[in-house]
Every structure is written in structure tokens, then in C-alpha cells.
């Protein structure tokens, strides 16, 4: 079974926020790696794409069996994508955060 995966506006805004954070951090460092923000977003999008085939393998988030979290490793840490399995064919990514952030919003 294949699922259609969509990112909500909030999730897209989270990707923009994470990109901007990494870019600003790298610009302030000696020996900056300006490809890092692009690599991070590519890793996130690649991880999110796995939800097309296996959303039920991700850990549950809260009481609903349809609200789940995808862990996307990157560097020494990674990211967490909160998503909802809406029905038998649709998955919505609701939010994305760095693993070291306390919460989604």
C-alpha cells in the first residue's frame, strides 16, 4: 500500500526555519559549511518520503494510533517529524523540529 504524503503549511514553515537557523549558524563560524543547510533539508525530505510506504513503523505520539513521529538522523543528532495518518491513503506531516528542541511550536 502506498500513501500520499503532504506537508502542512506549518511543516513547510518549520523546514524554512530549520534551514535559516543552520545557514545563520554556519555563516557565523570560521570554516563554514554552507552546504549543510541544504543537506539537512534533503535528509528530512528523504526521510519524509519513506512515509509513502511505511508510516505505521514509526513511533506513536500521544493517545491516537494515527499520530506518529518519524526520526530523521542527521549529523550527531537529527530531526523529528510529527505526522498523522489521515486515512488509508493519506499522510500529513504536521510539524518538524530538531531533536534538541523541547517541542514543535
For the regions a protein language model found, what residue spans apply to each?
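Basic, Lys/Arg-enriched alpha-helical interface segments
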Residues: 1-68
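Enriched for short, Lys/Arg-rich terminal
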Residues: 30-31, 72-105
Amino acid at each position: 500500500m502506498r500513501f500520499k504524503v503532504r506537508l502542512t503549511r506549518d511543516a513547510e514553515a518549520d523546514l524554512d526555519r530549520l534551514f535559516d537557523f543552520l545557514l545563520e549558524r554556519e555563516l557565523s563560524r570560521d570554516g563554514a559549511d554552507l552546504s549543510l543547510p541544504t543537506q539537512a533539508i534533503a535528509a528530512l525530505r528523504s526521510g519524509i518520503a519513506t512515509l509513502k510506504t511505511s508510516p505505521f513503523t514509526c513511533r506513536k505520539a500521544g493517545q491516537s494510533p494515527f499520530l506518529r513521529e518519524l526520526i530523521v538522523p542527521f549529523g550527531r543528532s537529527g530531526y523529528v517529524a510529527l505526522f498523522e495518518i489521515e486515512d488509508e491513503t493519506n499522510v500529513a506531516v504536521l510539524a518538524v523540529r530538531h531533536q534538541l528542541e523541547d517541542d514543535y511550536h
